[in-house]
Amino acid sequence: MSDKFGEGRDPYLYPGLNVMRNRLGIHQAQRLAQAAYEMTALRAATIELGPLVRGLPHLCAIHRQLYQDIFDWAGQLREVDIYQGDTRFCHFAYIEKEGNALMQDLEEEGYLVGLAHEKFVERLAHYYCEINVLHPFRFGSGLAQRIFFEQLALHAGYALSWQGIAVETWKQANQSGAMGDLSALRAIFQKAISEARETE
């Protein structure tokens, strides 16, 4: 579905095609991408806020809810190495260990509840970047992660909106974050995060 994945035989792909094996029997990348977009949009609307206390299993549950109609492995941690541009994501064998350690850190910070806006933005950018580099799933990590952090923000009294964020700006911010520079991510979240209204 893109050129972001590593070389070599990939068990997630149909033989000879750069198309992921799927439950829909689609063998064309563009058609699969469109179907995934439409079906995950419907599934996303059914995802409940979930508990304040959240860990790697909760992120997996979000992914499973989103992609259960499309991939047999929905909600399962990836078993191959992948990369995007100059960013090489976490080696698959370390995902569970590193993911649990990150979630433990998040728990020790009280899931960022009670932080003033500036501090919340700073810590959210940190955790967002770390989990993005983890990239736990073969496909769909980004969407699952965005929902995970939308929920986290709501529990902390904030609303996180992705509207108005340019795709290239977002990609560059994440790549810079992976290299240790969180300034662009913080700038984006500074604008994207606001106090939640009662109805949210």
From Swiss-Prot:
One MF term in the entry's GO annotations: AMPylase activity
UniProt keyword annotation of Zinc present: no
Every Fido domain range: 54-191
Catalysed reactions, semicolon-separated: L-tyrosyl-[protein] + ATP = O-(5'-adenylyl)-L-tyrosyl-[protein] + diphosphate; L-threonyl-[protein] + ATP = 3-O-(5'-adenylyl)-L-threonyl-[protein] + diphosphate
Tagged with keyword Nucleotidyltransferase: yes
The entry's keywords: ATP-binding, Nucleotide-binding, Nucleotidyltransferase, Transferase
InterPro entries reported in the protein's UniProt record: Fido, Fido-like_dom_sf
UniProt-listed Enzyme Commission number(s): 2.7.7.108
One Pfam family in the UniProt entry: Fic
A GO biological process held by the record: regulation of cell division
Record's function text: Probable adenylyltransferase that mediates the addition of adenosine 5'-monophosphate (AMP) to specific residues of target proteins. Involved in cell filamentation induced by cyclic AMP.
Identification of the protein by name: Probable protein adenylyltransferase Fic
Organism: Salmonella typhimurium (strain LT2 / SGSC1412 / ATCC 700720)
